[in-house]
């Protein structure tokens, strides 16, 4: 009786297995030996697709970048630059929140990762199209990445233990309710992100006023480079 055929090894299978390991156990869980065991193949066969662990993690990170919604930067979208940045930031953070262990890789920047570069291209093109000077558009892209990835690196509320005795009022008179934060982790963290995001965009809007006057009444509209096939 013939043996059942093993599924063909592919980049997508390797990335899928690596993503599952990262999500479940963190970056240190990924190794060529571990992946080969999970996939039921020999270790050297992975090198037909990736040169090393770093390339695999880059591909995992890029798969997360590909989940970020960029529709708000399309030429046909009616949202202005501020609304577009707001909605994109929420989508970006949601993708990172679903895969928190890969955030340190994404925080290094897009490098040569295609999906990551598409994100950078979309944001930069939309900001320049809306009237921001290229230098300012670059700073906005950097600022947004710092803010979003930084917020995804850890939970503020989750950093407080669920133990009332840890907060002796003699030592910490203002932390009497801190032990309750862990029970409201999502509400606190998402609320903090939204508050910070709106404050950031308010500040950018003030800086944008001279550029809006310079380019006309429709300056606030996102006018990115045309969509590529």
Write out the residue ranges for each language-model feature.
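Short, Lys/Arg-enriched anionic-surface-contact patches
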Residues: 2-10
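Helix-turn-helix
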Residues: 13, 17, 21-59
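Amphipathic alpha-helical interaction segments
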Residues: 13, 55, 87, 118, ...
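Short, basic, alpha-helical segments at the C-terminal edge of helix-turn-helix-like DNA-binding modules
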Residues: 63-68
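Hydrophobic alpha-helical connector segments
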Residues: 70-115, 134, 144
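Hydrophobic alpha-helical bundle segments that form small-molecule/ligand-binding pockets
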Residues: 117-169, 182, 204-207
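C-terminal peripheral helix-coil segments that are non-catalytic and often amphipathic
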Residues: 157-229
